[in-house]
UniProtKB/Swiss-Prot annotation:
One Gene Ontology biological process: ERBB2-ERBB3 signaling pathway
UniProt remark on domains: The cytoplasmic domain may be involved in the regulation of trafficking and proteolytic processing. Regulation of the proteolytic processing involves initial intracellular domain dimerization. ERBB receptor binding is elicited entirely by the EGF-like domain.
Gene from which this protein is expressed: Nrg2
Protein name: Pro-neuregulin-2, membrane-bound isoform
Organism, scientific name: Rattus norvegicus (Rat)
Any single Gene Ontology cellular-component annotation: plasma membrane
Length: 868
């Protein structure tokens, strides 16, 4: 028994104990042999052997202590063993009772047991006890000592020497356990970090932690296992043990009152049993009529909320299920019961008059009806029929009604399984419809917001286009009289004119660079209507205003403006070839005449109506409906291409070069020139003019008939527009070729006073412009001296005539009828004032030059800087 000797004793006592244990074994065997031969009782022999063992132990221990050699005492050879009956096993309760009786016999004082008895008890401690309770809380509450410890060592519980007659203990191991944690209610007087010996048949591992459920023994620090140890790392194991081992935690169960239920046949019903208190967790059992109920096909027992309640559930209740039910809850501290009733209403059957009497089916025929149907036997026809519950139909209640036709009773407190399915389906449909409505609402809101934003952007775009379509300079609106409403987007926008500065009057106008306007027109909020980029090319003589017949004017305007592809198309027709030949002949004749002509000069006033003035460009770019001036002109051989664009690219207009048209002799004359004196003198110039007129105007008669008034009087004004409106007639208040009233004899001052009024009134309405401009032009004209009808006098009468001529020439608008009447009139032409815009003609060039040399350089008028 070296395992016991090396448990917890010091070395000197260990040797003595080992020798005493050996001796006690031999003496106990001899005493048992002696007692077996005698007829005394087993108790007396056990007492004598215990007393002899005690005396022997005392003697041997004294001898061992007195011996100097230190050798272990060896007893004499034991007598020959005799067979003896096996001792009857005793229960633990009997052993504990024997121990208490021995303690009482010893004087009521507890003392250390003898070594022999300790070995006997230690052998008993190795017995395995399977736990009788399922719950860990029950085991903790039942066990006397509950600790958490760590296994430090393991030793086999081997038997004694071979000559020992004692039965070896049950197979197991002795573990040295270090106490790590304890519970106050089940501590057993142990302290933390204390080492105890525990015998257990359960497999243990070294250096592992366990919760031990122990029972104390007579020896201190020696325990036996009451239940198998458990691993504390399990799910809530330590927490469950702490719940039951705390102070005032363990209570007996107490159940709540059970509610009675009432239902129809075939419905789903349940009874609920719930514990209001109880620690450890109680277990539940159901009874009906004193008989315990178990789980079956129609009855189910379920637990919920951590086994705090139990539910008895009937899948399809029957009439025979009605009755009183008892629920019992029990734990280690006690138990409690509660009662409840289940009422089942049978289906009332209303039989028809033809069916006769009916009765319920017997037990063997009750299974004829399914799904909770009630079976009836109808006498007279000997046929079984079924009364089906709500939601089913058919002869045996096999068919199920659609959910939409199943209307449950609103008085029912507990709905069936079918009703729950219908309710779930209804909820799903409601959710689906609600989701669709919400989605449509969101889509509608998004559409409204998008429409509002698009409308706002469209309004801003239109406003931006209106701003881009407005003229870049307000001066353009003053060139054609009164202001007109804003143009539509479809109208061609007015192109900006680059040449804002009038060229110097001292320069001689001979040949100019041809300007081609490329279609680089861009509009932006910062630059409204940018001007086109000019490119220079060779150009013939400057364009002049053509005053011909209405037919020629209309054809020239159409050829100069409307034709888009004449200049580039091929000329294959005979008429085209003939026209080209005529133009070539006229052009060559003009070249010869131009070579013989001396250079001429223009004044600042003549530049106003030139093709380079802003007034000219305004009349060209303004639509015909809005402009009171219809501009007709002839183009040179090479005509620039105009391309006018608008902010809308679809409204861009491109004007390609027109057909080349040669200049006529009349076109080389200045716009407003001084007429030649009556009766053209002979010379090569007159012959050339007559031949030119006879070629182009064979029906008009000879050249001299065309008169100086036709060239000198009516050429001073622009032709009227054939598209003019009647409202603009009020601006044409002066008549140019009308003969003036006969002069009356008056003084110089009176004549000036009387004639100043109507002239000024007329000048105030020249072309719809301001009167100050007319006055400025009049002053500039009055400063420069001129001659009327070839005379160079500067008298007061000539000044009055100059004022009258100014009133006539300052208005550039003249109707076509007046122009034709002036051309065909036989009366002597009215000669305009001497100070006209152009100071030369073909016949009076030398006269004009001589007058200039005689008077000196004329005083130049101040250039009109007002808006045109």
């Amino acid at each position: 028994m070296r395992q016991v000797c090396c448990s917890a004793l010091p070395p000197p006592l260990e040797k003595a104990r080992c020798s005493s244990y050996s001796y006690s074994d031999s003496s106990s065997s001899s005493s048992s042999n002696n007692s077996s031969s005698s007829t005394s009782s087993r108790s007396s022999s056990r007492s004598s052997s215990r007393s002899s063992r005690g005396s022997t132990t005392t003697t041997s221990s004294s001898e061992n202590s007195g011996s100097n050699s230190g050798s272990i005492f060896r007893p004499a050879a034991p007598p020959e063993p005799r067979p003896q009956p096996q001792p009857q096993p005793r229960s633990p309760a009997a052993r504990r009772a024997a121990a208490r009786s021995r303690a009482a016999a010893a004087g009521g004082m507890r003392r250390d047991p003898a070594p022999g008895s300790s070995m006997l008890l230690f052998g008993v401690s190795l017995a395995c006890y399977s736990p009788s309770l399922k719950s860990v809380q029950d085991q903790a509450y039942k066990a006397p000592v509950v600790v958490e410890g760590k296994v430090q060592g393991l030793a086999p519980a081997g038997g004694s020497s071979s000559n020992s007659t004692r039965e070896p203990p049950a197979s197991g191991r002795v573990a040295l356990v270090k106490v790590l944690d304890k519970w106050p209610l089940r501590s057993g007087g142990l302290q933390r970090e204390q080492v105890i010996s525990v015998g257990s048949c359960a497999p243990l591992e070294r250096n592992q932690r366990y919760i031990f459920f122990l029972e104390p023994t007579e020896q201190p620090l020696v325990f036996k296992t009451a239940f198998a140890p458990v691993d504390p790392n399990g799910k809530n194991i330590k927490k469950e043990v702490g719940k039951i081992l705390c102070t005032d935690c363990a209570t007996r169960p107490k159940l709540k009152k059970m509610k009675s239920q009432t239902g129809e046949v075939g419905e789903k019903q349940s009874l609920k049993c719930e514990a209001a208190a109880g620690n450890p967790q109680p277990s539940y059992r159901w009874f009906k009529d004193g008989k315990e109920l178990n789980r079956s096909r129609d009855i189910r027992i379920k637990y919920g909320n951590g086994r705090k309640n139990s539910r008895l559930q009937f899948n399809k209740v029957k009439v025979e299920d009605a009755g009183e039910y008892v629920c019992e809850a029990e734990n280690i501290l006690g138990k409690d019961t509660v009662r409840g009733r289940l009422h089942v209403n049978s289906v009332s059957t209303t039989l028809s008059s033809w069916s006769g009497h009916a009765r319920k089916c017997n037990e063997t025929a009750k299974s004829y009806c399914v799904n909770g149907g009630v079976c009836y036997y109808i006498e007279g026809i000997n046929q079984l029929s079924c009364k089906c519950p709500n939601g089913f139909f058919g002869q045996r209640c096999l068919e199920k009604l659609p959910l939409r036709l199943y209307m449950p009773d609103p008085k029912q407190k507990h709905l069936g399984f079918e009703l729950k399915e219908a309710e779930e389906l209804y909820q799903k449909r409601v959710l689906t419809i609600t989701g669709i409505c919400v989605a449509l609402l969101v889509v509608g809101i998004v559409c409204v917001v998008a429409y509002c934003k698009t409308k706002k952007q469209r309004r801003q775009m239109h406003h931006h286009l209106r701003q881009n379509m407005c003229p870049a300079h307000q001066n353009r609106s003053l060139a054609n009289g009164p202001s007109h409403p804003r143009l539509d987007p479809e109208e061609i926008q007015m192109a900006d004119y680059i040449s804002k500065n009038v060229p110097a009057t001292d320069h001689v106008i001979r040949r100019e660079a041809e300007t081609t306007f490329s279609g680089s027109h861009s509009c932006s909020p910062s630059h409204h209507c940018s001007t086109a980029t000019p490119t220079s090319s060779h150009r013939h003589e400057s364009h002049t205003w053509s005053l011909e017949r209405s037919e020629s004017l209309t054809s020239d305007s159409q050829s100069g403006i409307m034709l888009s592809s004449v200049g580039t198309s091929k000329c294959n027709s005979p008429a085209c070839v003939e026209a080209r030949a005529r133009r070539a002949a006229a052009y060559s004749q003009e070249e010869r005449r131009r070579a013989a002509m001396p250079p001429y000069h223009d004044s600042i006033d003549s530049l106003r109506d030139s093709p380079h003035s802003e007034r000219y460009v305004s009349a060209l770019t303004t639509p015909a409906r809005l402009s009171p001036v219809d501009f007709h002109y002839s183009l040179a051989t090479q005509v620039p291409t105009f391309e006018i664009t608008s902010p809308n690219s679809a409204h861009a207009v491109s004007l390609p070069p027109a057909a080349p048209i040669s200049y006529r002799l009349a076109e080389q004359q200045p716009l407003l020139r001084h007429p030649a004196p009556p009766g053209p003198g002979p010379g090569p110039g007159a012959d050339m003019q007559r031949s030119y007129d006879s070629y182009y105007y064979p029906a008009a008669g000879p050249g001299p008939r065309r008169g100086a008034c036709a060239l000198g009087g009516s050429l001073g004004s622009l032709p009227a527009s054939p598209f003019r409106i009647p409202e603009d007639d009020e601006y044409e208040t002066t008549q140019e070729c009308a003969p003036p009233p006969p002069p009356r004899p008056r003084t110089r001052g009176a004549s000036r006073r009387t004639s100043a009024g109507p002239r000024r009134w007329r000048r105030s309405r020249l072309n719809g412009l301001a009167a100050q401009r007319a006055r400025a032009a009049r002053d500039s004209l009055s400063l420069s001296s001129g001659s009327g009808c070839g005379s160079a006098s500067a008298s007061d009468d000539d000044a009055d005539d100059a004022d009258g001529a100014l009133a006539a020439e300052s208005t550039p608008f003249l109707g076509l009828r007046a122009a034709h009447d002036a051309l065909r009139s036989d009366s002597p032409p009215l000669c305009p004032a001497a100070d006209s815009r152009t100071y030369y003609s073909l016949d009076s060039h030398s006269t004009r030059a001589s007058s200039r040399h005689s008077r000196g350089p004329p005083t130049r008028a101040k250039q009109d800087s007002g808006p045109l």
